[in-house]
Amino acid sequence: METELLSEARRCLDSLDLTKALSLCRDAVAHSPADADAHAMLGEVCLQTGSLEEAESALLRSVELTASGGAGRYMYLGQLADGPQSLQWYERGVDILRSQRSAAESASGEREELQARWLETTQALAIGLCAIAELYLSDLCFEADAEERCEALASEALDLVKPLEVKKRKKKRERERETKRHRPWTLR
């Protein structure tokens, strides 16, 4: 039952029907209070609606119920927290993303699906690293090694996205060549 509620809530969230998504998530939590995924989804929807206290409570409950799971919960908690606590949440999320990226690199299966998963994880990891770097520019700017940490994190994030940009440019050039090859010649 709660799986159906969460699936419907995800569809509502994707179509920006936040009121219905929130109602469905609350129903899922009420039906299954020990379901970490239901609490995580409730937290995500609450963030979208601006209910920050309820979001934090739901996300914390999700983490209490199971430490395993997606990095999103930790990244959201990093956004909601301040200073060192924010850093701890973000670092946990980044650790999960690193593990997921490594697993995607060594996984077997459908090539396009694996590439899509790896790409999505790599982009999320780069964003997470930038979020931590931003902390060292703001809340943690007075830490002794803030500048070095910020620089290292930003550099790591750039190293992750550079190959992605090269692949994008290569695909664009291939599409352009293909278009030119199939374009009929016209006389002027």
Residue ranges and their predicted role:
Residues 3, 37, 72, 120, ...:
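Start-of-helix register in tetratricopeptide repeats
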Residues 100-122:
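Acidic, Ser/Thr- and Gly/Pro-rich intrinsically disordered linkers and low-complexity segments
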